[in-house]
Swiss-Prot record:
Region (Disordered): 27-59, 100-120
Record keyword Nucleotide-binding present: no
Composition skew (Acidic residues), residue ranges: 110-120
Transmembrane segments: 76-93
Annotated protein name in UniProt: Dense granule protein 5
Main location: secreted
Chain's gene name: GRA5
CC terms in the record's Gene Ontology section: membrane; symbiont-containing vacuole membrane; transport vesicle
Record keywords, A-Z: Cytoplasmic vesicle, Membrane, Secreted, Signal, Transmembrane, Transmembrane helix
Residue ranges, compositional bias (Basic and acidic residues): 100-109
Length: 120
């Protein structure tokens, strides 16, 4: 059960990172105009290939962006999932810290009892 929760939290974190990455990439993406056409036919051919690749990249990027942030509800759900993931991660860390402290206190209590028993 705990491993399932960890997987869910990991998926949520990846979702948040994807939202952030797509948002940042969308605001900073700059597609060039192609280049200089002074090389004649070879230059035009390279420019056409480059333009085609850029259009393909742009369409893939836009489809990915639309899939992640295309709808306000989807974005809100993604952000809610991020909040849940962070809260779950913090709770998990808090539990681990408590367990470690409890184990240390048990070990120290056991060690003290052994010392008292040896002295007697």
């Amino acid at each position: 059960m705990a491993s399932v929760k960890r997987v869910v939290v990991a998926v949520m974190i990846v979702n948040v990172l994807a939202l952030i990455f797509v948002g940042v990439a969308g605001s900073t993406r700059d597609v060039g105009s192609g280049g200089d056409d002074s090389e004649g036919a070879r230059g035009r051919e390279q420019q056409q290939v480059q333009q085609h690749e850029q259009n393909e990249d742009r369409s893939l990027f836009e489809r990915g962006r639309a899939a992640v942030t295309g709808h306000p509800v989807r974005t809100a759900v993604g952000l809610a999932a991020a909040v849940v993931a962070v809260v779950s991660l913090l709770r998990l860390l808090k539990r681990r810290r408590r367990r470690a402290i409890q184990e240390e206190s048990k070990e120290s209590a056991t060690a003290e009892e052994e010392e008292v028993a040896e002295e007697e």
